Amino acid sequence: KKELPGAVAVLKRSFLSDAANQAELLLAATAESSDCALSVVEQPPLDGTKIALWAYLQTDVQTRVLPNGLYEVKHGVYRQLWMGGSFNRAANSEYQMRLLLNDYAMQLMEEGCTLADNCLRTWIFVQNVDCNYAGVVKARNEMFVTQNLTENTHYIASTGIGGGHADPKALVMLDAFAVAGLKPGQIKYLYARTHLNPTYEYGVSFERGTAG
């Protein structure tokens, strides 16, 4: 508090070395008192510690939990909408990813937003990524087409990486960030066509970065 006066957390992501044995205790200690989006993923910290915390803080904002589970962060004319740690237990990674994106799109609609116009960033954590990533890609590609997210419009900046959940049946986890109040054309998408080809050319659908 002394180093960052007035700052509040809007997202906390914990990286665990052994989610099956650590996640329940961690969530019990933090969930009830948390006023921000929480994400817990099994990715052993590189420095050898058992648990590491990544926190994103902001100042001069008002925060609250919305009825649909999203976390709202208001500043000026903008409303940031954060989601952390979403998962389900559908039969495989494709079905899980499809359900996660469909549910998230519905949450955004309740706030007058859409995936195409307002979602700026997703983080997708995939258990046993070598085996399950193909299902994630298929579900995302097919769902994005229904949301006017195509090679002719734009995609969403995203990280898709290996990461585990305390529940072995949870093959995919989703964190996401959207902003309500954006004007058409306000967001730009980062390209480096002289060095990197568009992602759709190798069968995936994400942007490498955004700028406002």
Regions found by a protein language model. Name each.
Residues 1-212:
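N-terminal presequence-like segments and the immediate start of the first folded domain
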